[in-house]
């Protein structure tokens, strides 16, 4: 049982997932700070100094805190956009690296083709002399 657990726990995918969760948490903290400390105050200035988190409607004794919802929605949009940009950058970087590898393989094949062509021509010359 211990052996099976060890094999499961130390597979590459599990470790990659653990690293992704830790990095994602750190990234989330950065984005949250960015939203709370930069975006929210700027939006407050744009809409006339309003702090979204304090916006509410009182109905009887109940308070509907729609400002918190607006803030959560803004946080979500910014986090989603940040993740989109990060993934887009990583995909572009990966694609560029793959293209470079393909170009290297094509270049290598071209050299091989050139050598094979030279060998073929030399063999033709030798067979024509005989």
Curated annotation (Swiss-Prot):
Annotated S-S bridges: none
Membrane-spanning segments: 14-34, 73-93
InterPro entries xref list: Mechanosensitive_channel_CS, MS_channel, MSC/AndL, MscL_channel
GO MF, one annotated term: mechanosensitive monoatomic ion channel activity
Protein's membrane topology: Multi-pass membrane protein
Assembly and oligomerization: Homopentamer.
Similarity section: Belongs to the MscL family.
Protein name, entry field: Large-conductance mechanosensitive channel
């Amino acid at each position: 049982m211990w052996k099976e657990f060890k094999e499961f726990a130390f597979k590459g995918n599990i470790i990659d997932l653990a690293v992704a969760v830790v990095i994602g948490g750190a990234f989330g903290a950065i984005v949250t700070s960015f939203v709370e400390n930069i975006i929210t105050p700027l939006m407050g200035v744009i809409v006339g100094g309003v702090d979204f988190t304090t916006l509410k409607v009182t109905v009887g004794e109940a308070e509907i805190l729609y400002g918190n919802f607006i803030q959560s929605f803004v946080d979500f949009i910014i986090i989603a956009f940040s993740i989109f940009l990060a993934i887009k950058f990583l995909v572009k970087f990966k694609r560029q690296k793959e293209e470079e590898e393909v170009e290297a393989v094509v270049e290598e094949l071209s050299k091989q083709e050139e050598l094979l062509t030279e060998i073929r021509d030399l063999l033709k010359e030798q067979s024509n002399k005989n």
